[in-house]
Amino acid sequence: MFSKSVTLAQYDPDLAAAIAQEDQRQQDHVELIASENYVSCAVMEAQGSQLTNKYAEGYPGKRYYGGCEYVDIVEQLAIDRVKKLFGAQYANVQPHSGSQANQAVYASVLKPGDTILGMSLAHGGHLTHGASVNISGKLYNAVTYGLDENEVLDYAEVERLALEHKPKMIVAGASAYALQIDWAKFREIADKVGAYLFVDMAHYAGLVAGGEYPNPVPFCDFVTTTTHKTLRGPRGGVILCRDNTHEKALNSSIFPSLQGGPLMHVIAAKAVAFKEALQPEFKQYAKQVKINAAAMAEELVKRGLRIVSGRTESHVFLVDLQPMKITGKAAEAALGKAHITVNKNAIPNDPEKPFVTSGIRIGSAAMTTRGFNEADARVLANLVADVLSNPEDEANLAKVREQVTALCNKYPVYGA
């Protein structure tokens, strides 16, 4: 029998120490990785609950195991809340990740060898949108579109390629594109060639939920998202549809095709996050995320850096480091020493290798969760520029680190 009085620190001090160190790192560092965020204590409580003990293959009311009457309630809460949040008629909350949600969408209506048209990874797309190293690029005939000479999504190219290749599915969405995407234009192009339209809104879902980014659900046959990133929930995925046309095919694609038992403790945490995103204060959060990102981009331009696409209309933007004569890899390392966490990222037509890159990606979701306002964002942008202007000067890095520490102490991740 397990005792509730035995703590992790008592039973496994080595693991507890590593978790404590990560907790301290999150407190002491400013998180600017666009795909990361902080979850609430309620989300963590749900994810750490005894729901992890329960197997529940199938769907609410249609399980292959007994004893599912209470986890059915949990899953139905998550389904109902996410449908309300995004105005969807169908929702599947079981995908373990965004990648698996995407796989399920493909498998529901495509056959191996069918043509898909998605955004190039090199121009800001995602691995799962047909990259050659991903299963999506191996199973399907992937054709890619990108940005025009102004680094704006090239809708004319999308239409030209669609007319030329007649894809069975067009994929929209990105992992490193700062501007708003025109879902209606994609719908128009898809209809011209009789293609399914699938949007992966993983990066923008929180902004969509908060009314600060266009909702793709009314325009699309399929929508997926992760539940972390800007949505501020546990790590996982969701599939949404505007109607129930593909319900049976999608449900079968997740179970039994791609997954077995759902992670009920994670689904519970998703339900909590969806409830949080339905609250009025989440709209203010989403608004502040955009304000902070725009403020940072403006300050970095003033300091001589170039923003890919010229500006941001979301939570994320890419910084071209070539004017500073520093690589993304070197910038990531230098900023890390100053307790500012970013990720190196390729920019369009990047001359550097993918593990080196000429850019970094910056996102404002996590810092905004901590409470950073526009003035703080501008201060932080200048600290980033201070590091990039002199990345090898240890005294400079120490000075910036001291200022970052003061900011972090002002805005603890988890208060009392």
From Swiss-Prot:
<keyword id="KW-0963">Cytoplasm</keyword>
<feature type="binding site">
    <location>
        <position position="121"/>
    </location>
    <ligand>
        <name>(6S)-5,6,7,8-tetrahydrofolate</name>
    </ligand>
</feature>
<dbReference type="GO" id="GO:0030170">
    <property type="term" value="F:pyridoxal phosphate binding"/>
</dbReference>
<keyword id="KW-0554">One-carbon metabolism</keyword>
<dbReference type="InterPro" id="IPR015424">
    <property type="entry name" value="PyrdxlP-dep_Trfase"/>
</dbReference>
<dbReference type="InterPro" id="IPR019798">
    <property type="entry name" value="Ser_HO-MeTrfase_PLP_BS"/>
</dbReference>
<dbReference type="GO" id="GO:0004372">
    <property type="term" value="F:glycine hydroxymethyltransferase activity"/>
</dbReference>
<dbReference type="InterPro" id="IPR049943">
    <property type="entry name" value="Ser_HO-MeTrfase-like"/>
</dbReference>
<comment type="similarity">
    <text>Belongs to the SHMT family.</text>
</comment>
<dbReference type="InterPro" id="IPR015421">
    <property type="entry name" value="PyrdxlP-dep_Trfase_major"/>
</dbReference>
<comment type="pathway">
    <text>Amino-acid biosynthesis; glycine biosynthesis; glycine from L-serine: step 1/1.</text>
</comment>
<dbReference type="Pfam" id="PF00464">
    <property type="entry name" value="SHMT"/>
</dbReference>
<feature type="site" description="Plays an important role in substrate specificity">
    <location>
        <position position="228"/>
    </location>
</feature>
<dbReference type="GO" id="GO:0035999">
    <property type="term" value="P:tetrahydrofolate interconversion"/>
</dbReference>
<dbReference type="GO" id="GO:0005829">
    <property type="term" value="C:cytosol"/>
</dbReference>
<keyword id="KW-0028">Amino-acid biosynthesis</keyword>
<feature type="modified residue" description="N6-(pyridoxal phosphate)lysine">
    <location>
        <position position="229"/>
    </location>
</feature>
<dbReference type="InterPro" id="IPR039429">
    <property type="entry name" value="SHMT-like_dom"/>
</dbReference>
<keyword id="KW-0808">Transferase</keyword>
<feature type="binding site">
    <location>
        <begin position="125"/>
        <end position="127"/>
    </location>
    <ligand>
        <name>(6S)-5,6,7,8-tetrahydrofolate</name>
    </ligand>
</feature>
<protein>
    <recommendedName>
        <fullName>Serine hydroxymethyltransferase</fullName>
        <ecNumber>2.1.2.1</ecNumber>
    </recommendedName>
</protein>
<comment type="pathway">
    <text>One-carbon metabolism; tetrahydrofolate interconversion.</text>
</comment>
<keyword id="KW-0663">Pyridoxal phosphate</keyword>
<comment type="subunit">
    <text>Homodimer.</text>
</comment>
<dbReference type="InterPro" id="IPR015422">
    <property type="entry name" value="PyrdxlP-dep_Trfase_small"/>
</dbReference>
<dbReference type="InterPro" id="IPR001085">
    <property type="entry name" value="Ser_HO-MeTrfase"/>
</dbReference>
<comment type="function">
    <text>Catalyzes the reversible interconversion of serine and glycine with tetrahydrofolate (THF) serving as the one-carbon carrier. This reaction serves as the major source of one-carbon groups required for the biosynthesis of purines, thymidylate, methionine, and other important biomolecules. Also exhibits THF-independent aldolase activity toward beta-hydroxyamino acids, producing glycine and aldehydes, via a retro-aldol mechanism.</text>
</comment>
<dbReference type="GO" id="GO:0019264">
    <property type="term" value="P:glycine biosynthetic process from serine"/>
</dbReference>
